[in-house]
Amino acid sequence: TATITDCVAADLKLYRDRGFEPTEIQADGEYNAVKTLFKDVHFSICSADDHVPEAERAIRTVKETVRATIHGMPYKRLPRVMVRELVTFAERSINMLPHSDGVSDTMSPDTIVTGRPRMDYRTMNLEFGTYVQVYDGTSNDVKSRTLGAIALNSTGNANGDHYFMSLATGERLHRRSWMPLPLSDLAITRVEAIATKE
């Protein structure tokens, strides 16, 4: 319930910050538990075996994008951080261009809702799952200044920063500098080992 509450509150804030005033949320039965917490919005809850068609279609599109991306990568298993970021990557990719059935022919859904200008393709120039060496800071010792990582997703900021998964720890990193390299069998094995260990 706390997760749904936090998500609804964050979404309402995002819309209101852009000058939109949501009056209705169409949802399934899981939202019954939180609808009384949001008095200023009407929750239209569908019946037990029913779904909101627009939401189901959007979910199906994200799943298809995720599935296609997974089948284009050489990994047999993916760590949780890669799966989470892949869903975000799919959603962001879908929403970065105007939709043919959308409210605008020139503005993307992302631009309409967030106010950010259309994402510059230069910030999306790194394919999900690419092996890279990321810059890991400067020091006066002889330790390596780069770290092996797997590209996850653009952060969406104007600097072109990206999120990566560290091959050393499996944790998500936020970096501005990287060097793409050919994907080695060792990197593939390491990604799968991180996934197996979770």
Which residues does each predicted region cover?
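Nucleic-acid-interacting cores, centered on viral/eukaryotic replication and modification enzymes
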Residues: 1-198
